[in-house]
């Protein structure tokens, strides 16, 4: 069935739903789809029936792994109901192992709904996702969910937005009742209350608009006047009017909130309970009222693929040439490769040719769909400002730019963190070998943080990713989707190596004379350490003057150095944090070649590296443990014994919160130990923080193990 697509971009919203794991993100999305008329029956996550969680593993585990995209339509309910809006939603995972899914979704969104747990407020993963949204400049509204939960506290949650995120909350609603008595919300703009009646067959579709309950009037007045103080300052005229009349119209308040939200100066806060069907419709109204349309977002800026110094911008209109960014790839049993794109300008039809400017290759668009979770709705064209799925593209990968062949542009690609954990996998039978290679190639195509490599010495296949859960799911998908049975080794930490000292004027000459044409390349190079804590991985600088090395050979030196860095210095782990500068060298008219200079670059690094004070780096995790007070001493003692350093201790509702930094190698099996120390009453989350130098005693053990001693 073909979908309507609204052509007026003012009425389109591209949004993401983002949160900490278990804050109720997928349930919130399910309710949105139900109330916008996309679903006829609500799917419950805990029953394994959720629409957005369509992979078998997601249904079993009740978590969201891949960001599903869907399109729905909405007419406001709390005011001006005649205008129809199109909302393209991406539901993103909250689990730390799936940060790539979150990163790539945020890159193509115009706005987001941040969902918080009404009892916990801002949690570690909410902070991570919030920072990712800051990085991509995504305006947000906040939805404090689970207001029916025991211990839910709206005002505490709002305070954590201020304190932990350093953000300015704009409270536009107050809850009516809490925990079991939560029945609705007060709208501080209209000064009305929306109350839901618990009639099961209604599923929260209807609510009553009533006067504010007496016991909340005073508090509502106080919060409204704070809201007016905040919004009046956006505009001098507005401030004057507010000071004169002591009030502003609903339209003026909404306009000012929209302005503050789009500028990311403040974040509207709403509340509800998605699971209990309360508060979702006013939140949808807030999505269209406050989050930007593609027209409110600045033009996308890219550069000329043939000259990176030339900036090009594309406006979100049909008149500008076609440009789009690939933000996700997945495999479909029938269509093969599904390529998810955000179209920034122009349009494209099925059958059109486009240029993949990242790879410099032409591609032909087969079919174009708008997705509803895992169902495809064909459309006649992909137009500026919307999100689509293309079929028929052959060599495209995540982060590629697609554009008009006659008007090429390259958009900024996406950066993904390096994997921190790896396991060896081997097929159970010879017949599985080829199937496994094919499956791993397809799966690594889908997820940029999942990598596959073959250990040259042992011949083993190593898969690496952001955490144990991610790798479990990959192995599970190989079994289910590709029918590959394999044995899995124990998880290993993805160590890195770096240098601490500069080595200057390292010289290397590669010379081979064997009848016929020989090989010759001479290089003089400097190798200096970079700041790995700031994510500086590698830099190559060409300072050769006077044509001592011809331009065509310079990239080969660079490639040679990078190849040598891959195989390590001390223990065979990839080297990071190196600035390589080629300062001089020599060529031979006949015997010099790209290969000769690649070997020279590689050998120059290999000879310099042992003199550059090499060290091993290990991934350090930011760990947060929430524990009842009586187990605090045991938990801290245990973290210290794992080479952890305690960063802070705080109080949260009924528990103590310990923040620590602990090496990943010490965290395997931690969940079982924590449960036994606290009788199952403590919980923890961890996420990648940084790489740090391994203490010498530990480094010696690692080197011995790598050498098989």
UniProtKB/Swiss-Prot annotation:
It is found in: Cytoplasm. SMART domains: EFG_C, EFG_IV. PROSITE patterns: G_TR_1 (PS00301), G_TR_2 (PS51722). One of its GO terms (biological process) is ribosome disassembly. GO terms for cellular component: cytoplasm. SUPFAM superfamilies: EF-G C-terminal domain-like (SSF54980), P-loop containing nucleoside triphosphate hydrolases (SSF52540), Ribosomal protein S5 domain 2-like (SSF54211), Translation proteins (SSF50447). Residues 10-295 form the tr-type G domain. GO terms for molecular function: GTP binding; GTPase activity; translation elongation factor activity. GTP binds at residues 19-26, 91-95, 145-148. Keywords: Cytoplasm, Elongation factor, GTP-binding, Nucleotide-binding, Protein biosynthesis. Its main location: cytoplasm. It comes from the Bacteria. Gene3D superfamilies: 3.30.230.10, 3.30.70.240, Elongation Factor G (Translational Gtpase), domain 3 (3.30.70.870), P-loop containing nucleotide triphosphate hydrolases (3.40.50.300), Translation factors (2.40.30.10). HAMAP family: EF_G_EF_2_B. PANTHER family: RIBOSOME-RELEASING FACTOR 2, MITOCHONDRIAL, TRANSLATION ELONGATION FACTOR G-RELATED. NCBIfam families: EF-G (TIGR00484), PRK12740.1-5 (NF009381), small_GTP (TIGR00231). Catalyzes the GTP-dependent ribosomal translocation step during translation elongation. During this step, the ribosome changes from the pre-translocational (PRE) to the post-translocational (POST) state as the newly formed A-site-bound peptidyl-tRNA and P-site-bound deacylated tRNA move to the P and E sites, respectively. Catalyzes the coordinated movement of the two tRNA molecules, the mRNA and conformational changes in the ribosome. Belongs to the TRAFAC class translation factor GTPase superfamily. Classic translation factor GTPase family. EF-G/EF-2 subfamily. This is Elongation factor G. It comes from Bifidobacterium animalis subsp. lactis (strain AD011). The gene is fusA.
């Amino acid at each position: 069935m073909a979908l309507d697509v609204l052509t007026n971009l003012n009425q389109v919203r591209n949004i993401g739903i983002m949160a900490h794991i278990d804050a109720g993100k997928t349930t919130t999305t399910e309710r949105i789809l139900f109330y916008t008329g996309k679903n006829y029956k609500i799917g419950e996550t805990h029953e394994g029936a959720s629409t957005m969680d369509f992979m078998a593993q997601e249904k079993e585990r009740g978590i969201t792994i891949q960001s599903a995209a869907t399109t729905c339509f909405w007419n406001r309910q709390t005011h001006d109901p005649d205008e129809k809006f199109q909302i393209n939603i991406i539901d993103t995972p909250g689990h730390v192992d799936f940060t790539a899914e979150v990163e790539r979704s945020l890159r193509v969104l115009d706005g987001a709904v941040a969902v918080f747990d009404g009892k916990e407020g801002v949690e570690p993963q909410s902070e991570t996702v919030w920072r990712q949204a800051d990085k991509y400049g995504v305006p947000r509204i906040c939805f404090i969910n689970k207001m029916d939960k025991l211990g839910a506290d709206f005002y505490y949650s709002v305070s954590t937005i201020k304190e932990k995120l350093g953000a300015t909350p704009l409270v536009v609603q107050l809850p009516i009742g809490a925990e079991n008595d939560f029945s609705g919300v007060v709208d501080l703009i209209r000064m009305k209350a929306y109350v839901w009646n618990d009639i099961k067959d209604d599923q929260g579709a209807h609510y009553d608009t009533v006067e504010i309950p007496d016991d909340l009037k005073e508090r509502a007045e106080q919060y409204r006047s704070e809201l007016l103080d905040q919004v009046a300052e956006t505009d001098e005229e507005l401030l004057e009017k507010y000071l004169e009349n002591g009030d502003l119209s609903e339209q003026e308040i909404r306009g000012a909130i929209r302005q503050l939200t789009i500028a990311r100066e403040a974040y509207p806060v709403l509340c509800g309970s998605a699971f209990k069907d309360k508060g979702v419709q006013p939140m949808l109204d807030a999505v269209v009222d406050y989050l930007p349309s593609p027209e409110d977002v600045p033009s996308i800026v890219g550069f000329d693929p043939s000259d990176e110094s030339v900036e090009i911008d594309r406006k979100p209109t049909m008149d500008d040439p076609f440009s789009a960014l690939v933000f996700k790839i997945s495999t479909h049993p029938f269509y093969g490769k599904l390529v998810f794109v955000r179209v920034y300008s122009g349009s494209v039809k099925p059958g059109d040719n486009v240029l993949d400017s990242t790879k410099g290759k032409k591609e032909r668009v087969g079919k174009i769909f708008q997705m509803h979770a895992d169902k495809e709705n064909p459309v006649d064209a992909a137009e500026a400002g919307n999100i689509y799925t293309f079929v028929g593209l052959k060599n495209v990968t995540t982060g590629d730019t697609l554009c008009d062949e006659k008007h090429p542009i390259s958009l900024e690609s996406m950066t993904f963190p390096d994997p921190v954990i790896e396991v060896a996998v081997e097929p159970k039978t010879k017949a599985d070998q080829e199937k496994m290679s094919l499956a791993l190639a397809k799966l690594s195509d889908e997820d940029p943080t999942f990598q596959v490599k073959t250990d040259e010495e042992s011949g083993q296949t190593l898969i690496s990713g952001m955490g144990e859960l991610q790798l479990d799911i990959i192995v599970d998908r190989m079994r289910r989707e590709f029918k590959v049975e394999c044995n899995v080794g124990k998880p290993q930490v993805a160590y890195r190596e770096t240098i601490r000292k500069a080595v200057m004027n390292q010289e290397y000459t590669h010379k081979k004379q064997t009848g016929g044409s020989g090989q010759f390349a001479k290089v003089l190079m400097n190798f200096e350490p970079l700041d790995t804590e700031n994510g500086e991985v590698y830099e190559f600088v060409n300072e050769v003057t006077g044509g001592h090395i011809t331009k065509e050979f310079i990239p080969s030196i660079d490639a040679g150095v990078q190849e040598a860095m891959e195989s390590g210095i001390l223990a065979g782990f990839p080297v990071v944090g190196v600035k390589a500068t080629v300062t001089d060298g020599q060529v031979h008219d006949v015997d010099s070649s790209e290969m000769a200079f690649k070997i020279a670059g590689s050998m120059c690094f290999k000879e310099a590296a042992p003199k550059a004070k090499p060290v091993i780096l290990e991934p350090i995790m930011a760990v947060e443990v929430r524990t009842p007070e009586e187990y605090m001493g045991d938990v801290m003692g245990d973290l210290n014994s794992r080479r952890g350093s305690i960063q802070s201790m705080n109080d949260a509702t009924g528990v103590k919160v310990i923040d620590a930094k602990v090496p990943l190698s010490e965290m395997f099996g931690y969940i079982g130990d924590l449960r036994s120390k606290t009788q199952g009453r403590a919980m923890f989350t961890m996420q990648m923080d940084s790489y740090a130098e391994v203490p010498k005693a530990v480094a010696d053990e690692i080197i011995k193990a790598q050498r098989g001693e």
